[in-house]
């Protein structure tokens, strides 16, 4: 369920606040700032296919750890390299892809763990947590940007992603030890 929360949180915060973050980097051109969302969306559309294919071939737990690590790296690099147009495009494409990858990979893990009627209930919970993330993401990251400046856009989401990685890694490790 954590992956759906992360997807909702990162998706809503990044799509909603990206134009605000981008504005100083595009000479206060509102149209150019809004167009940055297109690079984010292109990653959201293209990379989930690759992530789904990888999920069929490799250990999903390790793939989730890799995906989260990429998200953390990208989010910490965004404030540093966003002024470079080629890096901006690459980082936004990757951010969009890993964000949607949380959803794809989370659903595949859910489908492996639950079957039948229980899967229906688990899927409803999955969507519920996604919605909670979508509601919390923009105000939390927006407040961080108010308090700590424009760079908090990437850094705050990076810290949240790091917390998710820690919780995911340690809870999965505990579950595997008990089995």
Summary of predicted features, one role per range:
Residues 100-114:
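Intracellular juxtamembrane helix-capping segments at the cytosolic ends
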Residues 35-44, 126, 130:
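Transmembrane alpha-helical segments of major facilitator superfamily
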Residues 116-147:
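A late C-terminal transmembrane helix in Major Facilitator Superfamily
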Residues 143-161:
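A membrane-interface helix-boundary motif in multi-pass transporters
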Residues 1-13, 93-97:
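Pair of pore-lining "gating" transmembrane helices in MFS-fold secondary transporters
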Residues 47-59, 145-146:
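Helix-to-loop junctions at the C-terminal end of transmembrane segments
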Residues 16-32:
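Short amphipathic helix-loop junctions that connect adjacent transmembrane helices
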Residues 62-77, 158:
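Structural signature of the two symmetry-related core transmembrane helices
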